């Protein structure tokens, strides 16, 4: 074998980074594989935009078939994103006996089971290190160095846009809308930021991490997802008063034959390592029965870090090919017959501490009515703050509860919000402060 040819479908930001890395560090890569890795063909609908890279004549095409049907191409890199035509391209590559490397967390979070099964039948790899955490080597660690562990929890700050916004709100006391506008101007947020700020991107990623850690199949549609657009500077300030920071946290937990998988704003202690993950950085924390707690930290997006992760997967495939191996490891790290069936715990059944903020008239008996409704639903109060006394006007009342069941808390808030003393819908934020 004189070289290993790869084909790229999708020549956007990450695709450009992959091409640059192969061309820039080709000699280094060859010294670690044994033969050169050659980028033979790039398919994209736009082949006229100047991407700041010089490519050989004839490498670019608008026809993905030139990648998928080329018998010399052993590895297809899918970087177009989304569900279709990405899914069709990936399945066709597999059917043609080609290994697949992708950064498409949305595709795998929804259609992973079908894709993994197809790869198993054809004895080819599907690798996706770049789908979670950009350049942070978290997936290879789960499948490799930590494979002997039973995992109990996985927690992650997995979206740089949300983390940047919450960091600025925390440090400057700024409002959500103002920071979002700045993030868009700096290129940290898309013109339509819904995918990021409503937690969808993070939910795709935690679906993959939970599947990998717990050896089960979790799809995006099963993840409880709540974004950060409702977080106000008022909540940020009260969190600080209680010794917490607010982060968009992805949470996965296993309890016997049940699993939790959820994404939502979460208060975590300000002295906790995850609370110090600021700006556009990501972090993922695992707890294994033998390795204990382990945290990975780094840039979770961007051309260079993500391209680095893609090339890491390509090198892994290339080394297997040099050793005469087709598929060395199933995508989730478990033998196909060893995947567990775990039941997803509904959000109403989780137990947590809660931050509750009420906007109520400042008059005698208000706190008694609120605490009475909470007690009726088996919710006990740990601490309270009331600020801005103004008789006859509405003021914020903030309570921190002891651990309670979510459906009980929701029922209590539904009742309290009917009180004539309440002027705005009550606010709930979950607290994670007892992490293994």
Where are these regions (language model features)?
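N-terminal glycine-/serine-/threonine-rich beta1-alpha1-beta2 phosphate-ribose binding loop
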Residues: 1-96
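Rossmann-fold NAD(P)-binding glycine/threonine-rich loop
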Residues: 86-96, 105-143
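A short hydrophobic/small-residue beta-strand
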Residues: 99-101, 381
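Rossmann-like NAD(P)H-binding beta-loop-alpha module
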Residues: 120-201, 208
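Substrate-binding/catalytic subdomain of NAD(P)-dependent oxidoreductase enzymes
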Residues: 179-276, 280-283, 302
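Glycine-rich phosphate/pyrophosphate-binding beta-alpha loops
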Residues: 228, 292-294, 298-304
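Low-complexity, glycine/alanine/valine/leucine- and proline-rich hydrophobic stretches
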Residues: 264-289, 303-304, 375-391
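A conserved regulatory-domain signal marking ACT and ACT-like small-molecule sensing domains
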Residues: 309, 314, 318-436
């Amino acid at each position: 074998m004189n070289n290993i040819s790869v084909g790229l479908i999708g020549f956007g930001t990450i695709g450009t980074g992959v091409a640059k890395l192969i061309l820039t560090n080709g000699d280094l890569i060859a010294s670690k594989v044994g033969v050169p890795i050659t980028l033979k063909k790039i398919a994209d609908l736009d082949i006229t935009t100047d991407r700041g890279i010089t490519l050989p004549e004839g490498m670019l095409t608008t026809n993905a078939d030139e990648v998928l049907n080329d018998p010399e191409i052993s590895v297809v890199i899918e970087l177009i994103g989304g569900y279709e035509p990405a899914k069709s391209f990936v399945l066709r590559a597999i059917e043609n006996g080609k290994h697949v490397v992708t950064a498409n967390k949305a595709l795998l979070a929804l259609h992973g089971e079908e894709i993994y099964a197809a790869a198993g039948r054809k004895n080819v790899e599907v690798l996706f290190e770049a789908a979670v955490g950009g350049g942070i080597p978290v997936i290879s660690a789960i499948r490799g160095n930590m494979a002997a562990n039973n995992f109990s929890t996985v927690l992650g700050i997995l979206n740089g846009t949300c983390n940047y916004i919450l960091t600025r709100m925390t440090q400057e006391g700024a409002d959500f809308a103002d920071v979002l506008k700045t993030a868009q101007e700096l290129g940290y947020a898309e013109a339509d930021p819904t995918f990021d700020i409503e937690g969808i991107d993070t939910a795709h990623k935690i679906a993959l991490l939970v599947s990998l850690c717990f050896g089960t199949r979790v799809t995006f549609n099963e993840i409880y997802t709540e974004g950060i657009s409702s977080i106000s500077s008022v909540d940020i300030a009260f969190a600080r008063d209680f010794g917490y920071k607010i982060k968009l946290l992805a949470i996965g937990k296993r309890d016997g034959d049940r699993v939790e998988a959820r994404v939502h704003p979460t208060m975590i202690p300000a002295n906790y390592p995850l609370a110090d993950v600021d700006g556009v950085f990501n972090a993922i924390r695992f707890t294994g029965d033998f390795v204990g707690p382990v945290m990975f930290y780094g840039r979770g997006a961007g051309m260079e870090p993500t391209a680095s992760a893609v090339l890491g997967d390509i090198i892994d495939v290339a080394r297997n090919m040099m050793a005469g191996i087709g598929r060395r490891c199933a995508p989730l790290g478990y033998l196909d017959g060893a995947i567990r069936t775990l039941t997803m715990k509904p959000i109403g059944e989780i137990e947590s501490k809660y931050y509750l903020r009420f906007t109520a008239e400042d008059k005698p008996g208000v706190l008694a009515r609120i605490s009475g409704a909470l007690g009726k639903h088996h919710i006990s109060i740990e601490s309270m703050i009331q600020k801005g006394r103004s008789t006859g006007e509405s003021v914020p009342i903030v309570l921190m509860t002891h651990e309670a069941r979510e459906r009980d808390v929701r029922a209590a808030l539904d009742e309290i919000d009917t009180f004539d003393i309440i002027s705005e819908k009550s606010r709930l934020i979950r607290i994670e402060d007892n992490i293994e």
